[in-house]
């Protein structure tokens, strides 16, 4: 290398190079190469790249260092290249596979003390089946009792020492909240005292009054109920409601007085006082049954065997008969059935004569129940709780109970549970009670069909169901929908009333709106798999005969609430089972919308699913477009919203403040006859409105009186009970807005003034207009209630063309509205009945909290044998939001309240008084409330702020009003 040509930094400093010649030379070489390439292309196109590597200059960005995605993965794989990372940091690049699971389920079938084949065989013998609903007040021990039955039949399932098993609380939300939300079916085989096995289909129901719709669904498919009552608390709010509901459903009633350990360990009552407490509970229940039932033979008594005593916590359950049998097994040579008849009431044992007498032999003598049942029970509990080390082993040996040293070292509760379990054995007393006093499906079928089936009981189908015939035509009544573990699909749960349902069988599903005249609400489906449900696991079966409960796959799509499943062909006369009639009303209303409007379809799908899942839930769309959910209370709607957000739609949902539904009513008779003409001016209807007699609306809603009765029977009812004249009573056209609606339409026209034949021809149209009008009142589009509408005159066109439904129906609706507005309209609001349990020193605080919310106390009284008081009160539903939290704050958590819808009451003030000014963010005085409620409800629904009179009054009617100088508060 010549150093003179470069400087110290290596830069070239020599003479200029002859670059032009070099470029010409390079160009000639390139041209020659191109010609050679062309020749090679002609000879062999494929070998071009290999033989002659290109000498062209390739830019850095055009160089290919790696194979393309298409070369690596193939042309079938789509590859997406993004220039910018738009994924938020909170979202993983590769999302984990999420498995949605909302229920606690067993992974495999657990071991049972009986073979599954034996259970399946018992299903074919309907006389050995009992369909039972366990119901009772909140926390009175229903679920814990079922846990005892599960432990008895499933040797590997045991409750942990520190917490209850709660086997039927299968939802995670139920476990977290510590309260039952859904009714859960359990099917187990249980032996009676003689060792005979029976198949028990048991429905464990929630105790909270908000979820009484779940109880209704369970009662519909049961033949009897076992009513659970806490021995310390006695008959509570929901206990009374459930007694009434069971009697209305015509079910056999038995009672289990649970938690008797509380009398001993918590209240520390002497044995005699404990007996008085138990007898008081039995007497109270009998008093309620006699109040609601017409059957004088329906009496509950331990002597009859339809009352049992239990403590689920310590595995105690006995009837007088089963306790007497313990004596017979221990001492022998005792007729335990005769002995049991002498263990209740004012009967004493004389040890000298060894006979039972009705008179106490000495002043210190105890009643037989105290001496032979309570005192031994007290001694066992006292020994275990008090003196474990010294005298307990000897006492247990005398009772024939042998425990190991490890078992004797257990803590008090598990030790007490173990001792009682060994002493009392299995729950045979409970089985005896159910077998003797709750009918089998075969015996209970006829009254069940008469009460629930809308078709004829005398038809072939009715007789097959009454006989519980497994070979008859298929009839299955589903009352509940249970979602799958992931919340995607639903399975229908119901009872087979006749025939046998098979897996894979085509069936016809009849909805609640199906009639023989209108068959639109029906669909042919194919049954998927069939299961027998045992809470946390399901036993798959191929067929289920009449008398049994069944969980059905594949028929959920057309079912909304309840359904009737029958055969697709050859069963055309089949009618439906009537929809569930709930003992409460959904009056709390919330509006919902998705945070992201594009997710509205997901929310609508979620709303459809929660509507299936909750029996009494109502979802609807207002005219303003908002989606509204109606429920029975705050806890109920909280559970609904949890399921809607987490289970069924998985989206963020906004919820409006809760409000209540209102009703519209009148307090006077219409001030003048109101009339309306049809648009073609060929027909004219005249009506007036007046209030219904007190109690009549409730009778119609409770089906004490039915519009389907013949005119003579209907007339006699109104004449005798409500003092109507016979002509008016026999002229009732309809109830509204439906067959059990609290309004009446009466034809009060005279044959001398009106052509009855012509009027009869438009009767259906007038009734439709009346029902439409009473469904959406003029004040704020709410239900009209407690109003009697009288047709006073009618001019009807001779030609059928001029008196069609399109003319008559809207006119009838308009005249209903005008008559209503002329009769001093008022708003009605729902009132809750509240029951509060609190210590005596908290009673005054309860009064204070209620008074601040327009509530008032009706009764406060001590609970017998307990340090607590029961306060009964009424509170407006609209002022009840947050009441429970407020109450607990004021009583340091010592007061516990439950509230349930009770009645409708008129809101103070005139809703149409325009002189009232509603001031924002200020509580209104009582006389202004009706106006405030009406205006705010109308705004929420997207209606104009005031009632517009021109919509409801014809021009001739307005002229008539002007003539009579009627002052109206309404804007024109």
From Swiss-Prot:
Region of interest: Disordered: 1-54
Q: Which GO terms describe its molecular function?
A: GTP binding; GTPase activity; RNA binding; U5 snRNA binding
Known disease link: Mandibulofacial dysostosis with microcephaly: A rare syndrome characterized by progressive microcephaly, midface and malar hypoplasia, micrognathia, microtia, dysplastic ears, preauricular skin tags, significant developmental delay, and speech delay. Many patients have major sequelae, including choanal atresia that results in respiratory difficulties, conductive hearing loss, and cleft palate.
This chain is encoded by the gene named: EFTUD2
Q: Which PANTHER family match?
A: 116 KDA U5 SMALL NUCLEAR RIBONUCLEOPROTEIN COMPONENT, TRANSLATION ELONGATION FACTOR-RELATED
GO CC terms in record = Cajal body; catalytic step 2 spliceosome; cytosol; intracellular membrane-bounded organelle; membrane; nuclear speck; nucleoplasm; nucleus
The family classification in the record reads: Belongs to the TRAFAC class translation factor GTPase superfamily. Classic translation factor GTPase family. EF-G/EF-2 subfamily.
| Naturally occurring in which organism (per UniProt) | Homo sapiens (Human)
Residues annotated to bind GTP: 136-143, 204-208, 258-261
Q: Which PROSITE patterns match?
A: G_TR_2 (PS51722)
Q: Which keywords, in A-to-Z order, does the entry hold?
A: Acetylation, Disease variant, GTP-binding, Intellectual disability, Isopeptide bond, mRNA processing, mRNA splicing, Nucleotide-binding, Nucleus, Phosphoprotein, Spliceosome, Ubl conjugation
Q: What is its main location?
A: nucleus
- Enumerate the subcellular locations listed in this protein's record, separating them with semicolons: Nucleus
| Protein name (record) | 116 kDa U5 small nuclear ribonucleoprotein component
Domain (tr-type G) ranges: 127-409
